[in-house]
């Protein structure tokens, strides 16, 4: 699929231009984080083969790991059955979480 065909498959309207994106370790299957993408961040992710997200708090694009060096190299991108959520499998360099943990899901509630 080319970029335009990929973008047609995704329903950005439901989330007011944003879609939740689950980041999973390609090798272990561990869920590393959840972030949000808009069309531009998805385009940049596909173009650069590293993850780009939309920061809802800063209202800007950010390239995961650009500052810390903890980059995420894209191995595959999947879409859910409703076309409104992405799953991106990555090769994670260093920790995925800004706290220094491998995954953002390090706190157990139950």
UniProtKB/Swiss-Prot annotation:
Keywords: Amino-acid biosynthesis, Cytoplasm, Histidine biosynthesis, Hydrolase, Magnesium, Metal-binding, Zinc. It comes from the Bacteria. InterPro entries: PRA-CH, PRib_AMP_CycHydrolase_dom, PRib_AMP_CycHydrolase_sf. GO terms for cellular component: cytoplasm. Zn(2+) binds at residues 81, 97, 104. Belongs to the PRA-CH family. This is Phosphoribosyl-AMP cyclohydrolase. It comes from Clostridium botulinum (strain 657 / Type Ba4). The lineage of its organism: Bacteria, Bacillati, Bacillota, Clostridia, Eubacteriales. The gene is hisI.
């Amino acid at each position: 699929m080319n970029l335009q065909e990929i973008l047609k498959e995704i329903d950005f309207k439901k989330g007011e231009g944003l879609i939740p994106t689950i980041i999973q370790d390609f090798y272990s299957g561990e869920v590393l984080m959840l972030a949000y993408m808009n069309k531009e961040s998805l385009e940049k992710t596909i173009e650069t083969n590293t993850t780009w997200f939309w920061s809802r708090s800063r209202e800007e694009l950010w390239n995961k790991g650009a500052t810390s060096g903890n980059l995420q190299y894209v191995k595959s991108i999947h879409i859910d059955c409703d076309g409104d959520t992405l799953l991106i499998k990555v090769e994670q360099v260093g920790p995925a979480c800004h706290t220094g943990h491998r995954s953002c899901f390090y706190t157990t509630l139950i």
